[in-house]
């Protein structure tokens, strides 16, 4: 499951650029123009509607804290509209400018890379404790920081993760209702469709987002309700099996993932601690659970590139012993990968294992989105770092020590990367050691 980190700071008031919207024939995104059509505007409005009604499950009188980049303003304005129509008492939006973030790397003093605006993230955490919902709009440039010093990037990520942790803990424990949705942006579109003109690339990316988010359907809310029921049924089936481990086999992969004691499989929406039902990731095609942090053995190879905090990591290959990564390689971004797993001890261990059929709509699109929210829903994946306590029986009532005793991992990070394909087989291992097929050639057995 994608758990969006706080954006690298570069906050503006939303007036740093003129962004025309609504009655005009074109929307000016940060760089370049995208031609609107009535059909596009209708789908954009549907996306905003399902983000609020289905993704967030917003309650009457609830506040909303939203984060996004400047490029996402055409979508965020519609989300704000639907949030107020749904009864929001206040919507507060924090907009970040990616180009401002780059200026920090080019002109900021060395000490700045160990700093993060704790006051801002503490305020977000306080808002969540006071009952606010959280909505993140993703669409960042996958390679924004690819040319910057990996050591500085790592320091910024660590400082941000530490400062954001009080808020992130409320999110990973599902104490609040939250969701992540996507907005096509020029930089992201160029990365996905490098050979197309900018306007065509944006149109193609928007089309893919609408389809994956079911905003291209006449009644997207009903479509999501049906899809959500299917994911819950799959999770129920896996919970009934009570596997003690999963065994992944495929090219470059022979990995046994032990599952945490009293683990639960989840999929689709969930009821947060505040009683609101939400779908945290839009889109979502996964069912997932918590591995045992000390019971992972073998080696595994990534099947898709990972876009991590503005840098690309490709062809990841790691080896686990007693749950811990003891060897890690990558054909590109190896230094970034190494620094990521050195964030803390938990960064070398798994916090999530997820099953996704190769025939999922996102995989069937044939696109490499270079965005974890989408790519993780095209393939089975694992996540390094923080576990979700909700994937344990009564996990939301357990102390940190009790969670650890059951095998749940603890870390500043939670980074998903893809290991599934149409050449991956997955077996379920029972407590007695018996094995049975769960997936064959990337599909449910």
Locate the predicted segments by residue.
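Active-site bordering "gate/hinge" segments
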Residues: 21-297, 437, 444
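Dual-mode signal for accessory low-complexity, basic/Gly-rich regions
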Residues: 327-396
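Extended hydrophobic packing segments that form well-structured cores
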Residues: 401-445
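Short, glycine-/Ser/Thr-/acidic-enriched flexible segments
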Residues: 71-72, 140-142, 185, 253, ...
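Residue-identity detector for glycine
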Residues: 10, 14-16, 22
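Long, well-ordered mid-to-C-terminal structural blocks that present hydrophobic/aromatic surfaces
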Residues: 287-343
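Active-site lining segments that contact anionic ligands and/or coordinate catalytic metals
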Residues: 295-297, 313-315, 322-325, 348-352, ...
